[in-house]
Amino acid sequence: EIVLIGSRSAGRTAIDTPVPVDVIDVVELAAQGPQTTVNEILNYVAPSFTSTTQTVSDGTDHLDPASLRGLGPDQVLVLINGKRRHKSSLVNVNGTVGTGSVATDLNAIPAAAIAKIEVLRDGAAAQYGSDAIAGVINIVLRENTNELNLMVNSGANVSKHSEQYDEGGMDGERFQVSANYGLDLGNNGGFINFTGSLENRGATNRSDSMQQPIFTMFDTATRLLGYDQAFA
């Protein structure tokens, strides 16, 4: 027999909460917008959330550091169904967002597996510890059973600056398919939920050729001397 005689946090409603908590319905949002990852969804609806997709930046190409209120990625606590989610094993050592910190990999959780996301946009270090200085993100997973949810997303960038064709065209093609299904376990409300997601993201190139000479017949000293004479 286990008797609970105390708790660090008392139960309260949204009205009793002294700090703002954003509740994001991922199922409804996914049906309205093109956001396909947790970072993109939170960037779209949470004003204090920041996540930037990195390029040519070691492991942060796949693990996008996320932050709240402009603080470090290691100061954001991520919970899964109210339980603490572990940090990733990647240390940001390049000149990217959150250099020197260790963030939580939100991309490891498919958006199709999430029912809603709760974002506490204030410090909660007194309750959760120093890794909640910036705020807390609680991800609530789906609990549905005997129901198949299938989602397909596709898109691309259409621009005259695309170098795929001489006159412009499309690049950055993106395709994602995800599925979620749950099964009942036993007769006491148990269940198991499966989610799979596959994404293919193409490259985007906005570079152009340089149409002017890099080196000229005049060296730096001659050019500076000419300016000195002109303004003398």
Q: Which residue stretches match the model-derived regions?
A:
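N-terminal periplasmic accessory domains that precede
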Residues: 38-41, 45, 66, 79, ...
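N-terminal periplasmic "start-of-domain" segments of outer-membrane beta-barrel proteins
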Residues: 2-35, 39, 60, 89-99, ...
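Extracytoplasmic beta-strand/coil segments of soluble accessory domains associated
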Residues: 39-89
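Non-catalytic regulatory/gating segments with a bias toward low-complexity or hydrophobic composition
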Residues: 21, 29, 42, 117-118, ...
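Outer-membrane beta-barrel pore domains and translocons
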Residues: 7, 122, 153-157, 197-199
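Short acidic/polar hinge/loop motifs at secondary-structure boundaries
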Residues: 83-121
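Transmembrane beta-barrel wall of Gram-negative outer-membrane proteins
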Residues: 146-149, 163-232
